[in-house]
Amino acid sequence: MGARASVLTGGKLDAWEKIRLRPGGRKSYKIKHLVWASRELERFALNPDLLETAEGCQQIMRQLQPSLQTGTEEIKSLYNAVATLYCVHQRIEVKDTKEALEEVEKIQKKSQEKIQQAAMDKGNSNQVSQNYPIVQNAQGQMVHQAITPRTLNAWVKVVEEKAFSPEVIPMFSALSEGATPQDLNLMLNTVGGHQAAMQMLKDTINEEAAEWDRMHPQQAGPFPPGQIREPRGSDIAGTTSSLQEQITWMTGNPPIPVGEIYKRWIILGLNKIVRMYSPVSILDIRQGPKEPFRDYVDRFFKCLRAEQASQDVKGWMTDTLLVQNANPDCKTILRALGQGASLEEMMTACQGVGGPSHKARVLAEAMSQASGAAAAIMMQRSNFKGPRRTIKCFNCGKEGHLARNCRAPRKKGCWKCGKEGHQMKDCTERQANFFRENLAFQQGEAREFSSEQDRTNSPTCRKPRVRRGDSPLPEAGDEGKGAISLPQITLWQRPLVTVKIGGQLIEALLDTGADDTVLEEINLPGRWKPKMIGGIGGFIKVRQYDQVPIEISGKKAIGTILVGPTPINIIGRNMLTQIGCTLNFPISPIETVPVKLKPGMDGPRVKQWPLTEEKIKALTEICKEMEEEGKISKIGPENPYNTPIFAIKKKDSTKWRKLVDFRELNKRTQDFWEVQLGIPHPAGLKKKKSVTVLDVGDAYFSVPLDEDFRKYTAFTIPSINNETPGVRYQYNVLPQGWKGSPAIFQSSMTRILEPFRANNPEMVIYQYMDDLYVGSDLEIGQHRAKIEELREHLLKWGFTTPDKKHQKEPPFLWMGYELHPDKWTVQPIQLPDKESWTVNDIQKLVGKLNWASQIYPGIKVTHLCKLLRGAKALTDIVSLTAEAEMELAENREILREPVHGVYYDPSKELIAEVQKQGLDQWTYQIYQEPYKNLKTGKYAKRGSAHTNDVKQLTEVVQKIATESIVIWGKTPKFKLPIRKETWEIWWTDYWQATWIPEWEFVNTPPLVKLWYRLETEPIPGAETYYVDGAANRETKLGKAGYVTDKGKQKIITLTETTNQKAELQAIQLALQDSRSEVNIVTDSQYALGIIQAQPDRSEAELVNQIIEQLIKKEKVYLSWVPAHKGIGGNEQVDKLVSSGIRKVLFLDGIDKAQEEHERYHNNWRAMASDFNLPPIVAKEIVASCDKCQLKGEAMHGQVDCSPGIWQLDCTHLEGKIIIVAVHVASGYIEAEVIPAETGQETAYFILKLAGRWPVTVIHTDNGSNFTSAAVKAACWWANITQEFGIPYNPQSQGVVESMNKELKKIIGQVRDQAEHLKTAVQMAVFIHNFKRKGGIGGYSAGERIIDIIASDIQTKELQKQITKIQNFRVYYRDSRDPVWKGPAKLLWKGEGAVVIQDNNEIKVVPRRKAKIIRDYGKQMAGDDCVAGRQDED
């Protein structure tokens, strides 16, 4: 049981074991509860020795009490155990835990009343502030005020939200102001779930505590009366000091601020944790070529906060690195500001510099100065008849830039009509005379739409326009002669026009997103035929009239008209293309997100596969249209990258759809953080008075792609029979199917919606990809006005919201759901009825059923999923089992009647009810009012091969709790089909296993129950079976059997078995042959783990047999003993089953290894290598050494540097100076004790080091001895470069600093073997260099440095040979081409082949097809030589 079982002895132990865990319960306290409590106290950084006295228990209760409200169940259990133990110490008679808690509460109330009475007697005049943890009470004593749950809650929230970002440190400092070590430990305990971070923090505290003990040696002899002892490092950390001692130290005269000291240690540890969680160095923060200066400054200062440096060093970083790492544009401006410029001046000066807009402005200014001749050439290439117009700013009137890039103050009034009171975007004149022959405004009065601007690849807004066609337009004035001004309309409002159809005038919407023209009821002559078309509300029936004449603003067309119940008249693309109307799609003006390939990778170079003629024609048409809209651009042969494309027909359509196979590019593209981790759920929506659902049209094609990345999206449309070279394109916008598109689009959309959300807090916007749900409690008129405002806001940024998918009335179709004003459901689900099912069909069926299960209770898919087991092709035929057919029929019946869910009401409580369906399947409903489900679901996951219902029930509850936190932000109250007694039994034995929230019993059959129970203590009088099994890995033969305490034994032979199966077989044998009560002893942790979890079913047949035997028994006790430790029965049965099965391994090197470890304290890797020991044995030798358990092993060989680099530093031990040199690449150490820390001694040591090893660079700190003239002279003479670390930054000397600690640790292990420190230092150097193995290559440091130096020499020699080889050139022939190619560079020459490099391509050429000649250079070639003749040719 361990040392902690001795907390209670004699009569007190008897009293302890009589106290019940719960009122009326069967279980009572045991010694194991004391052992558990002592381990828990160690985990919470409390001294377990405090359990031995009543006062100690009081201290523990005071420490734990503030955490009871916010703490876990474990803290509450610990508090209950300590309170009961306190009553036993005080000899207060209690029957159970509840009575003990009541007694403790009475005692605490009495003491509290006494304190309050004393405070009242003292009067108000002497009251002091209650804002600090240590305050003065009424008697003038300094008492501790416990840290509040509110403070703890704030600290936990900071850690959970910020995840150890730099902001955590100042927050911790603020929250822990004036705190005692006890308070600080309580704060750390509340975030104990972050195990890795807490372990790092613990290591730092231990190091600092050890350093404190070294700097403050303990006073020898007894303390004088009345004098308090000096605190040790562990006292400051609160592990060996009481709260009263901490208060005395903090309030003494002179005070010892143990709280502040401990806080400083914790902050040191937090700094290390922050560095781990924010691994980017300040040196790596550089401004991108297109990154705005503001964003660069944000990143710089965020990283600066994480740097472990003083304020002076951070100031130096800000002054130098901020300017040094800016991009060239910003750097020029910043240097012009001079030294000492404030951050405000820098940001003002660099505003607008560095981003794409700045580049565009500079380019525009450069182009405006281009010569007229060059401009004329460009005009001819672009098919323009006249000279280009220079762009002119509406705001300041200057040429060379646009108004949106203008830096001058904004001119008042409208830029379109000149009137004040509104801006151009709100101008009412902009829609006048749509599609007229002349533009609305005269030359010079407003913005002129030049043909140049219409042709740009990145227009700023979508504009339908008429192509040059039958009726050319008049010229727009003298200045614009030769240039065509096309009529156009900006889509600030819906493009409604008057059209003439069959002599009737009607108003219709120009809709480039619609394939067909659809009109409301209109009488048309001629015959018609019926047709069904798809719309947003489902399918509608229409009448189709062919060859109908239509006139739009004087333009005539003839085509098909559909007449039916459409909400608005639509002129579709079938008519718009005839009159030459095109749509200029906007590319959003927001800044592009920079994208890169993964390091070391190049773009895709996948060849285009052959395509059929119809697919090539379809792709040509699609790409022509995309090019006109600016989505793609043609490219030349200079782009070496390619991605294959293909085409498929749209569902239920004759139209084609272009698909690009971006799999190869996706592999090579950098990874993106998934902006949205899941889809929003309608059960989490709050009921709203007004709702609208919008869809963003051509979502990805509205966001620009990073210009530098566009080249990697290149693709080719081939020609039939290779008639002509393929036409090459690249994307200008986010492509469909590329891995970065979703993340970049979501990020861009969030930034665009942010200002609208801030200005309209009453509007709730759910955004997922291109679907927007907008809800509010406004009246419908106000709500729709806000929706139009939102649509206009999106349009400014280039995102359209088509009317076709603008849903104003319920039911709303959103994210696969159907939303009604007071309820929701999934969109109608039709299960297919097939004669034969393929794997793909079953996969789709299971997907549909899983989707339906969130609102239809009782859906099951277990047997359908079993049909998919194994590696099967998608087209394989699967025959349904009888169980799967029954499951499918039940699901059809469930889906027959529609089921609805309701919306969430924050004022009401959430309730979750769980039912067991059988066959490891569970269903649940989450609701606030009975029979009105918010959401339903199912659970059919099996956590392990061996399980039981109680364990599965806890998994179901945890799934529901997680789901509820995601959707509603809180956990529901649970109603579970399990009796309290069953849960109590499980909880008593397995209380560490899981957590469960508040719940109540519901009598809904089938109830969950435990089928058998293992005893916790041996059964007196029952026979004891020692069981064991063994198997041979090669032959798969094995034995299993048992030996009993009464002399019985049985051994059986097994075939095709394993060690684990044999161990289980032995237990099954013992259960089979034993009586109703039995004790079983095994040495298998595997078997023990399976059976102790009390499974009632398993996937393994053998385990099912064991379960059947267990259910039949009245009592079973199962115990474990370690193998091969000479334990009686276990040793006997082990010999019986091992005979002829196990191979015996004689470890005769153990004694020698132990002897060497006692002398050198070498690590386990060195012993395993030198003495041929298994790692587990070598680790056991280290573990049993008391001197090697101070701290874990240091890691070596983690840094990869040049062979000649050494780091030097001086460290102090026992009042003496040790100079240490570390070879960075290998970790090899040279060290010695020097008489003084002077430049002369340091220079002498450097010369000794250079005489032993090749030293090219030494890296030191800025100490006076290292910066002295003597060291500089020594370095100059030995031709050594000296480098210095960053001031006050220990990380710059990280290797030697860590080696200093390692060296001191080894010295501590061997110090008692040496009389003088200098001897111990050399012993420690020897041990480190030759007796510790690990790191790169698994060598010792001595072996590694020799290997590195030898490799360096070989590499240099090889490099010389390579250099000689590279002086030769190779002419070669390919297998099919008889022409000699070259000259190529010779990389390697072998017996049968040569390796060459030709135009960056490396090739292997057979020796017989290569001619090798020396490259003498052209300067040696005369007129008559071969080189000269070749040049002439």
Curated annotation (Swiss-Prot):
Ranges of compositional bias, category Basic and acidic residues: 445-455
Domain RNase H type-1: 1019-1142
Tagged with keyword Repeat: yes
GO cellular component, one term: host cell
Region Interaction with human PPIA/CYPA and NUP153, residue ranges: 189-227
SMART domains in UniProt: ZnF_C2HC
Protein name stated in the entry: Gag-Pol polyprotein
Organism: Human immunodeficiency virus type 1 group M subtype G (isolate SE6165) (HIV-1)
